[in-house]
C-alpha cells in the first residue's frame, strides 16, 4: 500500500520517455532502484514513490488524483483530454513545466507510391492511428471527413495489411516509416515531455517537496543547456571576445600573474559553443580555452 503522505510520481515503465525520466529524477538527487518487473519503486532518501506504468495510463492517473505528478508526452496528455471532453468530462490538472526531452511529432504518412496534394487527399480515406481525437481535431478544422482505424501498436503496418489508406503516428527520425514503405506528408502535432500535477491542493509537506523538486529540475535543465568556459584572454580584446559567446553571462575576470597583458576569464554560456566559435576566440588572441560540462546549477 502506497502511503498517502508520500509524493507519488508516475513515469513511463518502458519506451521513449522512460530512460530520460529516470535520469532526470536521479540527477535531481532522488535515489531509486528500479527493478524490471516491479511497477512501484520507493526513493531511499526522500518520501517519494515512483509508479512505472504505460505512457497512456499516466494522464488518467494524474487526472483521477491517483498520483500527484506525472512525466508525460504532451501528445498522450492531449489525446486523453480530448477523449474525456468528448465524454462530457471537464478534466483539470496543473502544468508544472515543459521538460527538455521527448521531442517528437504526430504526422500523417502515406505509402511512398501515393501522390500527395495536401490534406484534401485524405477525404473519405481510412486512416490508422493510436490518436483518433488529435487526428479528428486536426482534420475537422480543415473540413475533411475520414474513417478512423484505431490501432494501439504497429500502426505503420496498416497500409500493407490492407487495413488503411494512410496512417497518423508518432515520428522521431522517420526510419520506421521508411522501413515500412511510408513517407511523412503532414505534421499535425508537435510534442515534448511535460511534468504535470493533479488538480487540487497538496499537503504542506508534499507541496514543499514539489517546490524543492522544481528548483532541482530547473537546475538540471539549465546545467544541460549550459557550458562553463575558461580561457586566457588579451585585456584589449575582452569586449570582442564576450560578443562571440552567445548566451554568456558577464564573465569573472582575474589577473594572470605571469602576464599583465592577459586575464583569466570564467563564464557560463547558455548556448552551444561550436568549434568555429572557439577558432574565432583563438583568432582574437584567447589561449588555453576550456569548455566544460556543468553537473548542477542553482541560481
From Swiss-Prot:
GO cellular component: cytoplasm
Its EC number(s): 2.4.2.17
Pathways involved: Amino-acid biosynthesis; L-histidine biosynthesis; L-histidine from 5-phospho-alpha-D-ribose 1-diphosphate: step 1/9
Keywords, sorted A to Z: Amino-acid biosynthesis, ATP-binding, Cytoplasm, Glycosyltransferase, Histidine biosynthesis, Magnesium, Metal-binding, Nucleotide-binding, Transferase
Catalytic activity: 1-(5-phospho-beta-D-ribosyl)-ATP + diphosphate = 5-phospho-alpha-D-ribose 1-diphosphate + ATP
Listed InterPro entries: ATP-PRT_HisG_long (IPR020621), ATP_PRibTrfase_cat (IPR013820), ATP_PRibTrfase_CS (IPR018198), ATP_PRibTrfase_HisG (IPR001348), HisG_C (IPR013115), N-reg_PII-like_a/b (IPR011322), N-reg_PII/ATP_PRibTrfase_C (IPR015867)
Main subcellular localisation: cytoplasm
Gene Ontology process terms (BP): L-histidine biosynthetic process
Compartment(s): Cytoplasm
Top EC class of this enzyme: transferase
Activity control note: Feedback inhibited by histidine.
GO molecular function list: ATP binding; ATP phosphoribosyltransferase activity; magnesium ion binding
Names of required cofactors: Mg(2+)
Task performed by this protein: Catalyzes the condensation of ATP and 5-phosphoribose 1-diphosphate to form N'-(5'-phosphoribosyl)-ATP (PR-ATP). Has a crucial role in the pathway because the rate of histidine biosynthesis seems to be controlled primarily by regulation of HisG enzymatic activity.
Family: Belongs to the ATP phosphoribosyltransferase family. Long subfamily.
Protein name: ATP phosphoribosyltransferase
Gene: hisG
Amino acid at each position: 500500500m502506497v502511503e498517502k503522505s508520500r509524493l507519488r510520481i508516475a513515469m513511463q515503465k518502458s519506451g521513449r520517455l522512460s530512460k530520460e525520466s529516470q535520469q532526470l529524477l536521479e540527477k535531481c538527487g532522488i535515489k531509486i532502484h528500479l527493478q524490471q518487473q516491479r511497477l512501484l519503486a520507493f526513493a531511499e532518501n526522500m518520501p517519494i514513490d515512483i509508479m512505472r506504468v504505460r505512457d497512456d495510463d499516466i494522464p488518467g492517473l494524474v487526472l483521477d488524483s491517483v498520483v500527484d505528478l506525472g512525466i508525460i508526452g504532451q501528445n498522450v496528455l492531449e489525446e486523453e483530454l480530448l477523449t474525456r471532453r468528448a465524454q462530457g468530462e471537464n478534466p483539470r490538472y496543473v502544468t508544472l513545466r515543459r521538460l527538455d526531452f521527448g521531442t517528437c511529432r504526430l504526422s500523417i504518412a502515406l505509402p511512398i507510391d501515393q501522390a500527395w496534394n495536401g490534406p484534401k487527399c485524405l477525404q473519405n480515406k481510412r486512416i490508422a492511428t493510436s490518436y483518433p481525437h488529435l487526428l479528428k481535431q486536426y482534420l475537422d478544422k480543415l473540413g475533411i471527413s475520414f474513417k478512423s482505424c484505431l490501432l494501439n501498436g504497429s500502426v505503420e503496418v496498416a497500409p500493407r495489411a490492407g487495413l488503411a489508406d494512410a496512417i497518423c503516428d508518432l515520428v522521431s527520425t522517420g526510419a520506421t516509416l521508411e522501413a515500412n514503405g511510408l513517407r511523412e506528408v503532414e505534421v499535425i502535432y508537435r510534442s515534448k515531455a511535460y511534468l504535470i500535477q493533479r488538480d487540487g491542493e497538496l499537503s504542506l509537506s508534499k507541496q514543499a517537496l514539489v517546490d524543492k523538486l522544481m528548483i532541482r529540475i530547473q537546475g538540471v535543465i539549465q546545467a544541460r543547456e549550459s557550458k562553463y568556459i575558461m580561457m586566457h584572454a588579451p585585456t584589449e580584446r575582452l569586449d570582442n571576445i564576450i560578443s562571440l559567446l552567445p548566451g554568456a553571462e558577464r564573465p569573472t575576470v582575474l589577473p594572470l600573474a605571469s602576464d599583465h597583458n592577459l586575464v583569466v576569464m570564467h563564464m557560463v554560456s547558455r548556448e552551444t559553443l561550436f568549434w568555429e566559435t572557439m577558432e574565432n576566440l583563438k583568432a582574437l588572441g584567447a589561449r588555453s580555452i576550456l569548455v566544460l560540462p556543468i553537473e548542477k546549477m542553482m541560481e
